[in-house]
Amino acid sequence: MFRSLIKSLQTGARTSGIRKMTSYGDYVKFMELVGNVKQLKRTGWVLRSVNDPETVASHMYRMAMLSFLIPEASSLDGIKCMKMALIHDLAEAIVGDITPYCGIDRAEKQRREHKAIHEISSLVPTMAGDEILKLFDEYEGQTTDEALWVKDCDRYDMIQQAFEYEKRDEVPMKHQEFFESTRGKFVNPFFLHMVEELNKQREEYHENFTARLEKTNHSSSS
């Protein structure tokens, strides 16, 4: 499937007998827009003054890597999940990372992102562009097993990232709100187990951190 995508980028594609001509200039522009998400900091972390927060691209990358962990017995299309993860926030290359705190309602957010993803997909040949649009709309619709998996990836990456910031900055339980926001929302059993393990490690870190702090304070007061 990756070969067919690369081939379409190189030679163009046909849909309903219509050939869309694209140029290497379009490809450079496409890659420039993709590059925007490599620099775009995720709004949720910025608003909470997290030092050196992750970018949108790094978030999507780890979501895509989760596709390698799809259980072997699963009927999920792993390549499709990986592609969907890599494009689900691609519209943010143009509109930015819009969150509920930005003062923009959901309908307007969807309108802006829909316009942006069409602009981005127009820079690649028809077959590739159609696939980008289809995957984007499928994710937004949340009606397929793959879309539900990728949404779970989105939620899971966020809470693992929150825990990693807690450890890096030595602020146990500081980002509890992110865990609360995902509680009861995971669908796939795989992620239920992942969240259980993550919470276990987070509690252990909190307990160990507290014990070390109490020991340090006791030594200082002696």
What feature does the model see in each segment?
Residues 2-222:
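Alpha-helical, largely C-terminal catalytic domains
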